[in-house]
Structures are given as structure tokens and as C-alpha cells.
């Protein structure tokens, strides 16, 4: 479920051309029984709506697959990791638990999705392939653009993104 972390950063760049049903009333912050602080609530709802494309108030494996462009097995695995009540879906409460409690584990899982060869760093080419898999707004960055992103995040100048640099970048996005 670690990919949820990257969703929070990328959600605003998703294709906006999808027709969307109005969100269920439970997602209205003024009516929500959720205990999240008011300032955090809108971000949670925004991320949840990015996943919940049919507006039924639940995230299915199919919606997870559509969002990430991953395999059926990967999508089912992500849903299962967050699905605390065992109904086969991720509710907004379950997503909140992942976003609040999954912190470091979720970041590590997101980092590992980018680090294709498992060597502990993300190269510009790994970044480029990961962004293609996510297919954000049809974005297809050049190798040079990905190298610029790596350089901007690479605080120690070794030409790659370490996990610590990834954590720092994600905390700035939050």
C-alpha cells in the first residue's frame, strides 16, 4: 500500500477528463464522523477521491489498478494491505489509517516501487519508467528532465536518490 504516499503527491496531476459521480455525503467534511483534524481532512478526502473514481465511497482493486496502471495481483495486494475489515475494499477510514500509521513502511514501499533493481537508490531512468507506469496526465518526461528532478532531490551529489533523500522530498510534498 506504500504507493498511496506517491498518490498524495501526484493526485492533482491525474487526468481530469474522467466523468466523476458526485462524492458520497460521508466525504463532506461538515458531515463526516471522522476524527481527523480539520486541516488534514481535505487532503485525505482529495486523495481518497482520486482513487474512488466511481464515487461509491470505497476503493476497489480495479480502481487501484486504474490509478497506478499496475497488475491485478499488485492492485489486490495493495487493497489487502489496507483492508482492515476484510470486505475487499479500502474505506476512507482505512486509507486514513494507512496515511497516518503507515508512515515509514509506506514510504519504503513507495521507494521500492521506483527502485526497480533493488540497489537502494533511484536513478533518473528508474524515475522515468516509474512515472510512465503511473501515466500521470500522459506525462512523458525526457531523460534530461528526469535527471534534473534527480539532481534537485540529490542532496549529497552522487547522482541518484537515496531513501533518505526520497523521505525528505516526500515530507516537503506533504
Swiss-Prot record:
Domain EF-hand: 39-74, 75-100, 102-137, 141-174
Taxon lineage: Eukaryota, Viridiplantae, Streptophyta, Embryophyta, Tracheophyta
GO function term, MF aspect, one: calcium ion binding
Residues annotated as binding Ca(2+) 4: 154, 156, 158, 165
Organism: Oryza sativa subsp. japonica (Rice)
Keywords associated with the record: Calcium, Lipoprotein, Metal-binding, Myristate, Repeat
Binding site for Ca(2+) 2: 83, 85, 87, 94
Function: Potential calcium sensor.
Pfam families given in the database record: EF-hand_1, EF-hand_5, EF-hand_7
Name recorded for this polypeptide: Probable calcium-binding protein CML20
Chain residues that bind Ca(2+) 1: 52, 54, 56, 63
Transmembrane annotation, as ranges: none
Region Disordered, residue ranges: 14-35
Residues bound to Ca(2+) 3: 115, 117, 119, 126
UniProt keyword Calcium, yes or no: yes
Covalent lipid sites (N-myristoyl glycine): 2
Glycoprotein among keywords: no
InterPro entries: EF-hand-dom_pair, EF_Hand_1_Ca_BS, EF_hand_dom, EF_hand_pair_protein_CML-like
